[in-house]
C-alpha cells in the first residue's frame, strides 16, 4: 500500500515513520509513504501558501494553487487512479472509525491532505478531495496529528504488518466490542491478583471469560456500539447473564 501525505510540516512525521509498527512496515516494504511538502509547490518567491479570506474574517486560508500543483504532480504516477482515494482531515468531516480504517486499508493508494490555518480554499475541497474525515469533535492546530492517526490505524490493518493477524481482529471496535481486560506477569502485584481463570489453562473457559468481559466493558463504556452489533448465540447468552448480574443496566436484547 502507498500513502501520500500532503503537509506544510513534513518534519512532524519523521519520528512516526521511524518508530514501532509503521517503521517496521516501511522497512519490510509492506507500505510506502511519500511526504509532500506543499510549500515546494508555491509560486511565491517566499514560498507563501496562505492568504486573507475573501469577505473578511479571522485568520488565513491555504491557497489553492500549491495544493492543485502538488496534486498534479501526484497524478503523473500511473498508479494514482487505481483504487486510490484522497481524504482531507478536518473537524467538519465524517467521524473516523475502525470501519473507515478497514475501508482505507483496502486501497492501493491513499492520499491524505493536511489543512492548516483557518482551512483550505473551498475549491480544493470541491475538486480534489474524495472524502473529508474528522478524528473528533475538537480543533487542532493542523491536520498532521489526525493524519498520523489515520496512518497508524490503516497501517496495522495491512495484511502481514502485525505478524499475528489475530491481534488486529481482537482490537477494540473491530467487531463493535471493546477489548477484554489484559493482564501479564506477575500474577500478584501489591496484593492485586490476576483473575484465576486466566491461569487455569482451560482455553474454552478462558475464551468465554474474554467474550463476557468484552461484552460487559462495551455495555458499561460504549453501549452505543451494541446497536451495531449482531450477537452470536453465545454472546446473547452471556449478555443475559451480564444483565442479571447488573440489574441497573438496561438493554433491549431483541434489537441485537
UniProtKB/Swiss-Prot annotation:
CDD domains: TrmD-like. S-adenosyl-L-methionine binds at residues 115, 135-140. It holds the Pfam family tRNA_m1G_MT. It catalyses: guanosine(37) in tRNA + S-adenosyl-L-methionine = N(1)-methylguanosine(37) in tRNA + S-adenosyl-L-homocysteine + H(+). GO terms for biological process: tRNA N1-guanine methylation. Disulfide bonds: none annotated. Its EC number is 2.1.1.228. Its main location: cytoplasm. Specifically methylates guanosine-37 in various tRNAs. This is tRNA (guanine-N(1)-)-methyltransferase. The lineage of its organism: Bacteria, Bacillati, Bacillota, Clostridia, Natranaerobiales.
Amino acid at each position: 500500500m502507498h500513502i501520500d501525505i500532503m503537509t506544510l510540516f513534513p518534519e512532524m512525521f519523521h519520528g512516526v515513520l521511524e518508530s514501532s509498527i509503521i517503521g517496521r512496515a516501511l522497512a519490510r516494504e509492506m507500505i510506502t509513504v511519500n511526504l509532500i511538502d506543499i510549500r515546494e509547490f508555491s509560486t511565491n518567491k517566499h514560498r507563501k501558501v496562505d492568504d486573507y479570506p475573501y469577505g473578511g474574517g479571522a485568520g488565513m486560508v491555504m491557497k489553492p494553487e500549491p495544493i492543485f500543483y502538488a496534486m498534479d504532480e501526484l497524478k503523473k504516477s500511473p498508479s494514482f487512479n487505481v483504487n486510490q482515494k484522497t481524504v482531507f482531515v478536518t473537524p467538519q468531516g465524517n467521524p473516523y472509525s475502525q470501519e473507515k480504517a478497514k475501508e482505507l486499508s483496502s486501497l492501493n493508494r491513499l492520499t491524505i491532505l493536511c489543512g492548516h490555518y483557518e482551512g483550505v480554499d473551498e475549491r480544493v475541497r470541491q475538486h480534489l478531495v474524495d472524502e473529508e474525515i474528522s478524528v473528533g469533535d475538537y480543533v487542532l492546530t493542523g491536520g498532521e496529528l489526525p493524519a498520523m492517526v489515520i496512518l497508524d490505524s490503516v497501517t496495522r490493518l495491512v495484511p502481514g504488518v502485525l505478524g499475528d493477524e489475530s491481534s488486529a481482529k481482537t482490537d477494540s471496535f473491530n467487531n463493535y466490542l471493546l477489548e477484554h481486560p489484559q493482564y501479564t506477569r506477575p500474577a500478584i502485584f501489591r496484593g492485586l491478583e490476576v483473575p484465576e481463570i486466566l491461569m487455569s489453562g482451560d482455553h474454552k473457559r478462558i475464551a468465554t471469560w474474554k467474550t463476557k468481559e468484552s461484552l460487559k466493558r462495551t455495555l458499561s463504556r460504549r453501549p452505543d456500539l451494541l446497536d451495531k452489533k449482531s450477537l452470536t448465540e453465545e454472546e446473547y447468552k452471556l449478555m443475559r447473564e451480564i444483565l442479571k448480574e447488573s440489574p441497573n443496566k438496561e438493554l433491549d436484547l431483541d434489537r441485537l
